Amino acid sequence: MPKRHAVVAGAGIGGLTAALALHRRGWQVTVCERAPELPATGAGIGLAPNALRALDAIGVDAARAAGSAIPITMGVRRPDGRWLTRTRTADMASRYGIAPIAVPRPAFTAALAAALPSGTLRYGTTVTAVDDAGGRRPIVRTSAGHDLPADLVVAADGIHSALRRAYFPAHHGLHYIGETAWRMLVDAPDLRLPAMSETWGRGCRFGVTPLSDGRYYLYATAVVPPGTRSADPRTELVHRFGSWHDPIPALLDHIRSLEPDDILQNDLYDLAAPLPVLHHGRIAWLGDAAHAMAPNLGQGGCQAIEDAVILAHLLPAGDAGHAGNGGDSTDPADDAAPANDADSTNAVAAALAAYTAARRDRTDAVRVRARRVGRLGALRNPLAAAARDLAVRATPGRLALRGMDDLFNGFRLPA
């Protein structure tokens, strides 16, 4: 039977999750990714209970697919090592039904990509424009010179989304949150660290996340003007954090063995204001393209996963609505003339309006909260930082965990 066709712009976590969720709803999917291949190196990602529930809804076991670690504790420390707050992941599992996990980002994206049919991903291909004038069925233009007719376009093209700029030209765009971030993976099986931690200094932070294979996902931030770069990030990290508590110096020793290109540095931006809607015609925005947020809650990828799963859930099944070639071809161009385009348009339009209603307020609340948490972590004034530390230490652990309920229990499939 002919299938509806979706074109996904971007093969990040949000785009690949959307592609897989749509595929399992019966859609034919084409993913256009500008990179020549999926990255083999990079950073890690924490998957919170809300993201794990969303993945479970489409039959993805992230822990099994990508290899995961469950830390014993999670919390925030001072540079001298004193814990400001700490939570056992067993308590989180008891409260939320599942413990958060940490996975290598390259392994996770590779697992999502491997679950898609052969030929779904088109590497080295950028979506350059979407021709949907007059409300007609979109034609996706690509850098490879191919025109892809689509019943749905998923704009998962990242924080600098070209499709967002094209369709929301009056939007304020991105907001620099005042920090740069370094991210890296280091191999240190000798350390055997049980805790996921973030250490707050004055205007700088250092995070440690154990992975399952003896590696650690490390990140660090510093308050600097945008565009600030050092000649060697390894030296910069040792200079900034070498005197902090154990095991940070030992981890920095492992960083010395990395190549400079193994350390990713990005200035941190979020969306200056929410988009008025998360859809236009038959285009839906998700992840950073829709609601770029600071990484301070570990929810950027998690919210992208929620977006993708809820979008696919709300859309009509993909195996209806076309006459075309009988569905045997794998080329979406062969399916360019659906028999009931009006019905297809109406069904998709209704689903996308429901998607905006389901996702816009939640994702913007997370974006705003992440910015506020980042401001706390980035305080440079000694008195303000000391007051912050006292306030965090004085907050009971149960109350702090309860404060995460809206995040970790917030995923729901709309009726």
Predicted regions and their residues:
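Conserved N-terminal Rossmann-fold NAD(P)-binding element of oxidoreductases
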Residues: 9-10
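Glycine-rich FAD pyrophosphate-binding loop
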Residues: 23-43
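C-terminal helical "tail/cap" subdomain of flavin- and related membrane-associated enzymes
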Residues: 2-4, 65, 81, 250, ...
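Conserved N-terminal helical subregion
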Residues: 1-6, 23, 48-168, 172-185, ...
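N-terminal Rossmann-fold NAD(P) dinucleotide-binding loop
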Residues: 15-16
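Flavin-dependent oxidoreductases
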Residues: 177-209
